[in-house]
């Protein structure tokens, strides 16, 4: 949840600034943010609690939180893991599966995600 435009590539910034662009976030990403907040790895002066942060995701950042449906778990169960780059993060795999199942593009700066394009991931790479 960065408002630091230096962390976004010009292409991603342009896409995000389009008025008709609707932004979504997986419940798995929200879960990761809550864990980071509770472990003091994520902070913001405006958030007093993790719940405040979740409200901010929707109300300040205008992201729609998408629940993980069982169909996502079927995609996840079939996902071939990027062992070449030792990509073993199960949360990343759920987020990738979520995007693939819903046929939605995924914005990420993680170079390991490119591997999943051949399985159906539509990746918008954010080159920092």
Describe every region a protein language model picked out:
Residues 27, 58-83:
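Acidic catalytic patch
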Residues 1-26, 41-52, 128:
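Short, well-structured N-terminal submotif of metal-dependent ribonuclease cores
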Residues 86-87:
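Residue-level "hotspot" positions that anchor or transmit function at local structural transition points
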Residues 90-91:
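Acidic donor-binding loop at a coil-to-helix junction in glycosyltransferase catalytic cores
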Residues 94-128:
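Acidic, PIN/NYN-like endoribonuclease modules and their adjacent C-terminal/linker elements
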Residues 37-64, 71:
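Active-site-proximal, substrate-binding regions of enzyme catalytic domains
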